[in-house]
Swiss-Prot record:
One GO biological process term: carbohydrate metabolic process
Organism of provenance: Corynebacterium aurimucosum (strain ATCC 700975 / DSM 44827 / CIP 107346 / CN-1) (Corynebacterium nigricans)
Keyword Metal-binding: yes
Name of the protein described by the UniProt record: Phosphoglucosamine mutase
Keyword Transcription listed: no
InterPro entries, alphabetized: A-D-PHexomutase_a/b/a-I, A-D-PHexomutase_a/b/a-I/II/III, A-D-PHexomutase_a/b/a-II, A-D-PHexomutase_a/b/a-III, A-D-PHexomutase_C, A-D-PHexomutase_C_sf, A-D-PHexomutase_CS, Alpha-D-phosphohexomutase_SF
Bound cofactor: record note: Binds 1 Mg(2+) ion per subunit.
Residues binding Mg(2+): 104, 243, 245, 247
Post-translational modification note: Activated by phosphorylation.
Known function: Catalyzes the conversion of glucosamine-6-phosphate to glucosamine-1-phosphate.
Enzyme class: isomerase
GO molecular function (one): phosphomannomutase activity
UniProt GO cellular component terms: cytosol
Length: 447
């Protein structure tokens, strides 16, 4: 049986792979699985649904809400809000489950559905498998009359609750900091500028006018050059770029240099260690993090725990070890004491708070880490499963590792959300990394 769930929920081309019928059935199955172990039966199960502003979101929102209600779940639809806001609100409302409809940084025609359990936590693989199994065994025998769930549309205070939460978490006065924020015409188009302004920062917002069709279009964290240009143009102290669902954040210093997720983690880790907030002096990162992060943390006396790629695996390790900071090079930064998932807006606030407390520029803070040259090539493939077992790929990897020696590394892995295979090479020199990565990518493409 083909697994329906990827590393970040169910994704696909909206109305083709991800249809309203599929969304309805997902809602029904999730209702059965996620409400079966409830401790309290004093009220009906409750679900929170949010979405990003892409055009298919309204259609899928209505479908999954109907599926949940048809299985006796009351539904609160909070409208367009970031993924971390839905995780927070699931907990804040005391809901039994949360649903976010978004394809994150993917192009507008795609969409996705991800679930949160009670407390706003991402689902483990085992629970997702139970939902898929429940879909295969759905019947028409649903509740009737008064046992059907109610649907409350566009709950008015969801955004206000989330903004209040952010203000309570980051209390540092950000007055005197000028920030450009690119919201990717996505889910944070309103809340991110509002949160930064509420903290005292002077905000220049760009790509913050979603029209259902322009999400991630030449903007946001996947087009960081737009933020770089705007920071220089407006003479800002920094820039922050989010993706479509605002669970990630990349930064730009005053000179227009990119500060990626690894550098952001290094900045926050050092600051948290100074304030005795970095539990066990440990940072959780993935195998894709730059070798420079490991070297910098060693210098600072900070340990690194490595995980597979994907913020869900970072979250699992954070929870397992009770650590207080983790993330990915892509800009997913997780502060588990304050949010159950990556939160781009909270990350932005935390970066600016570190600047305000230290009196240092972002460039000065980022200098704690030297980024080694890294080349990443995304290779479209038809069957991700066969790549790593192909003899020619194994031979190419061995040759690349021999060429790089101890001054670099090679990592090949399938994308969890797209039909791509990622080829990553780090080396002492950029040209060497580019050359080795190009050779490997050509071999992968030919399989």
């Amino acid at each position: 049986m083909t697994r329906l769930f990827g590393t970040d929920g169910v994704r696909g081309l909206a109305n083709k792979k991800l249809t309203p019928i599929l969304a309805l059935r997902l809602g029904q199955a999730a209702a059965e699985v996620l409400t079966s172990d409830r401790e309290s039966y004093e009220r009906r199960p409750l679900a929170i649904i949010g979405r990003d502003p892409r055009v298919s979101g309204e259609m899928l929102d209505a479908a999954i809400a109907s599926g949940l209600a048809s299985r006796g779940v009351d539904v609160v639809r909070v409208g367009v809000l970031p993924t971390p806001a839905i995780a927070f609100l699931t907990d804040d409302f005391g809901a039994d489950l949360g649903v976010m409809i978004s394809a994150s940084h993917n192009p507008m025609p795609d969409n996705g559905i991800k679930f949160f359990s009670a407390g706003g936590k991402k689902l483990p693989d085992e629970v997702e498998d139970r939902i898929q199994a429940a879909m295969d065994n759905l019947t028409e025998d649903g509740p009737t009359a008064t046992k059907i769930g109610r649907i409350i549309s566009e709950a008015p205070d969801g955004r206000e609750r989330y903004l209040k939460h952010l203000a309570e978490v980051v209390t540092t006065d950000l007055s005197g900091i000028k920030v450009v924020v690119d919201t990717a015409n996505g889910a944070a188009s309103k809340v991110a500028p509002q949160a930064y302004e509420a903290a005292g920062a002077e905000v220049v917002a760009i790509h913050n006018k979603p029209n259902a069709f322009n999400i991630n279009e030449d903007c946001g964290s996947t087009h960081i050059e737009k933020t770089q240009e705007a920071v220089v143009e407006h003479g800002a102290d920094l820039g922050l770029a989010h993706d479509g669902d605002a669970d990630r954040c990349l930064a730009v210093d005053a000179e227009g240099n990119v500060v990626d997720g690894d550098q952001i983690m290094a900045i926050l880790a050092v600051g948290m260690k100074e304030e005795n907030d970095l539990r066990f002096n440990t940072l959780v990162a993935t195998v894709m993090s730059n070798l420079g992060l490991k070297l910098a943390m060693q210098e600072q006396g900070i340990d690194i725990k490595e995980t597979a790629v994907g913020d869900r695996y970072v979250l699992e390790e954070l929870n397992r070890g009770d650590f207080s900071l983790g993330g990915e090079q892509s800009g997913h930064v997780v502060l588990p004491d304050d949010c159950t998932t990556g939160d781009g807006t909270l990350t932005g606030l935390s970066i600016m708070a570190r600047m305000a407390k230290s009196g240092k520029s972002l460039k000065e803070l980022a200098s704690v880490m030297t980024v080694l040259p890294q080349v990443l090539i995304n290779v479209p493939v038809s069957d991700k499963a066969v790549i790593l077992n192909a003899p020619e790929v194994k031979e190419a990897i061995a040759a690349a590792e021999a060429e790089l020696g101890e001054t670099g590394r090679v990592l090949l892995r399938p994308s969890g959300t797209e039909e791509l295979f990622r080829v990553m090479v780090e080396a002492a020199e950029k040209e060497q990394a580019r050359k080795v990565a190009g050779k490997l990518a050509a071999v992968v493409a030919a399989v």
